[in-house]
Swiss-Prot record:
InterPro entries membership: D12N6_MeTrfase_N, DNA_Adenine_Mtase, DNA_methylase_A-5, DNA_methylase_N6_adenine_CS, SAM-dependent_MTases_sf, T1MK-like_N_sf
Name by which UniProt lists this protein: Type I restriction enzyme StySPI methylase subunit
Recorded GO MF terms: DNA binding; N-methyltransferase activity; site-specific DNA-methyltransferase (adenine-specific) activity
Note: Type I restriction and modification enzymes are complex, multifunctional systems which require ATP, S-adenosyl methionine and Mg(2+) as cofactors and, in addition to their endonucleolytic and methylase activities, are potent DNA-dependent ATPases.
Region (Disordered): 424-443
Residue ranges that the Swiss-Prot or TrEMBL entry lists as coiled coil: none
EC number: 2.1.1.72
Gene source species: Salmonella potsdam
Subunit structure: The type I restriction/modification system is composed of three polypeptides R, M and S; the restriction enzyme has stoichiometry R(2)M(2)S(1) while the methyltransferase is M(2)S(1).
Similarity field: Belongs to the N(4)/N(6)-methyltransferase family.
Entry's Gene Ontology BP terms: DNA restriction-modification system; methylation
UniProt keyword list: Methyltransferase, Restriction system, S-adenosyl-L-methionine, Transferase
């Protein structure tokens, strides 16, 4: 049975648990524990990780209340295991299963699945890929918690493919989530090194224990990330509890992260309640995304490269935001901006971009002034489909951007303006600074170049650069005063939100409605929605 079939069958088992009050998120947590036990059994690694008496067959051999009690004891025992990595995965883990028959059915069903593909058993990476599939399923279904800003896997794959991590390079994600960027970086290096077999023993050991470092604020999400890494044979530094550390990037934990040759990350959007900024940055600000940008600049060594997914406000916010962008373009070679389409994140309506940059310049990695000369911008947002379940965002949508980006990971491949995928030539040209003195044909393309001097003089160091006119845009001159529009919009939104809340509860999605209300409360500074 292939991995996709196994993921589908494992996810179908969730329906029975849902009837018993187990949420999707809790189901993934249960599967994480059980899948680890099963992985050790199927790959012959039980002796490496699990003490005798606390293995898959020990759990399977029991039924009913005895099995549930044994399972609870097993979680406690492994959470205090002498092996630090196992301890980190199982620490403070409790089962949410309360009915013995549910656990028996889950264990029995998992045991009866065909864990073979032809004549071959599942490898450790097979279990890892399967687990990633479950995480994506969870993100699709919940759209909240760990899944609300789940980075689309096609985007992660493109970013890593363009950054091209090499053996013995350290890759860091300071907002690790479920470790998607780190897993993809590991996958890329393995694809270039015959699954690490082309490397000597020291280099292989480096890849397993030192190459990948993440930091995650939420304990439950960190556990999912640790499990993801472990299933992909990424152990990380055991003194820090594995590849994914628990802590706050915007505090002392972030300062203690090692320097990294590559940073690939998607910091949390919005207020991110619970994330306190206790760290002293060069440009103090309450905007957490701007603080993450400063962390990336600080953590990169000369010549290090980065890709960061950021919301639009990072590109145009004034005051400290302007100072931070100037710092970025001074100390780093900001060579590429990818304007992402809306709807690709499960937090609907969020407008995002990817910034690609190198610390210093390739010619002089230690350069810390005037490192940015030209910034190339690819507009994958204007007049693109509304992505979602019906219109999924795929690798094919990113292929034209990958082509014009080029093979050089520092963005130094020969580049030419002009790329007209997705009917760009049919777009109208906006009346904007970007199109003054622009060739009409080039102005309809998705791929343009803007000089550092132009960004300074024409945009006052804003990086909110767009030149195509959205076909659904409205002429601003015909609109009422802004305060009137804002009041009308807020009134309509309040009414619509109330109706949607009632509808979701009628449809039996009360937990999802509560999650969305919590997001609203965070957005309004804790005021009850």
């Amino acid at each position: 049975m292939n991995n996709n079939d196994l993921v589908a069958k494992l996810w179908k088992l969730c329906d029975n648990l849902r009837d018993g009050g187990v949420s999707y998120q809790n189901y993934v947590n249960e599967l994480a524990s059980l899948l680890f036990l099963k992985m050790c059994k199927e790959t012959g690694q039980e002796a490496d990780y699990l003490p005798e008496g606390y293995r898959w067959d020990d759990l399977k051999s029991r039924i009913g209340q005895e099995q549930l009690q044994f399972y609870r004891n097993l979680l406690v025992h492994l959470g205090a295991d002498e092996k630090k990595l196992v301890q980190a995965v199982f620490q403070n883990v409790n089962t949410t299963i309360t009915q013995p028959k549910q656990l028996t059915e889950l264990v029995s069903s998992m045991d009866s699945l065909d864990w073979y593909n032809g004549d071959h058993g599942k490898s450790r990476d097979d279990f890892g890929d399967m687990y990633e599939g479950l995480l994506q399923k969870n993100a699709n279904e919940t759209k909240s918690g760990a899944g609300q800003y789940f980075t689309p896997r096609p985007l992660i794959k493109t970013i890593i493919h363009l950054l091209k991590p090499q053996p013995r390079e350290v890759v860091q994600d300071p907002a690790a989530g479920t470790a998607g960027f780190l897993i993809e970086a590991d996958r890329y290096v393995k694809s270039q090194t015959n699954d690490l077999d082309d490397l000597d023993g020291d280099a292989q050991d480096f890849q397993i224990k030192k190459a990948f470092v993440g930091l995650e604020l939420v304990p439950g999400t960190r556990r999912l990330a640790l499990m993801n890494c472990l299933l992909h044979d990424i152990e990380g530094n055991l003194d820090h509890g594995g590849a994914i550390r628990l802590g706050n990037t915007l505090g002392s934990d972030g300062e203690n992260l090692p320097q990294a040759d590559i940073v690939a990350t998607n910091p949390p959007f919005g207020s991110a309640a619970g994330t306190n900024i206790t760290r002293t940055f060069v440009h103090p600000t309450s905007n957490k995304q701007l603080c993450f940008m400063q962390h990336i600049i600080e953590t990169l060594p000369p010549g290090g490269r980065a890709a960061a997914v950021v919301p639009d406000n990072v590109l145009f916010e004034g005051g400290k935001g302007t100072d931070i962008r100037r710092d970025l373009m001074d100390k780093c070679h900001l060579h590429t901006i990818l304007r992402l389409p809306t709807g690709i994140f499960y937090a609907q309506g969020v407008k995002t971009n990817v910034l690609f940059f190198t610390k210093g310049t390739v010619a002089n990695p230690n350069q810390d002034k005037n490192c940015t000369d030209d910034v190339w911008v690819y507009d994958l947002r204007t007049n693109m489909p509304s992505f979602g379940k019906r219109t999924p965002f795929t690798e094919q949508h990113l292929q034209p951007f990958e082509t014009v980006y080029g093979e050089d990971p520092h963005g130094l491949s020969p580049r030419t303006e002009g790329e007209w995928s997705f009917n760009a030539e049919e777009s109208e040209v906006a009346d904007s600074e970007e199109n003054k003195n622009a060739d009409q044909h080039q102005a309809t393309s998705r791929w343009r170049k803007f000089s550092r001097e132009w960004i300074r003089t024409a945009k006052s160091d804003s990086l909110d650069i767009s030149w195509l006119k959205d076909k659904d845009s409205i002429d601003a001159d015909s609109l009422p005063e802004p305060d009137v529009l804002a009041a009308e919009a807020m009134g309509e939104l309040v009414q619509a939100l109330g109706e949607l809340d009632a509808l979701m509860r009628e449809l039996g999605a009360g937990d999802e409605a509560d999650a969305q209300r919590q997001l609203l409360e965070e957005a309004f500074g804790g005021v009850k929605a």
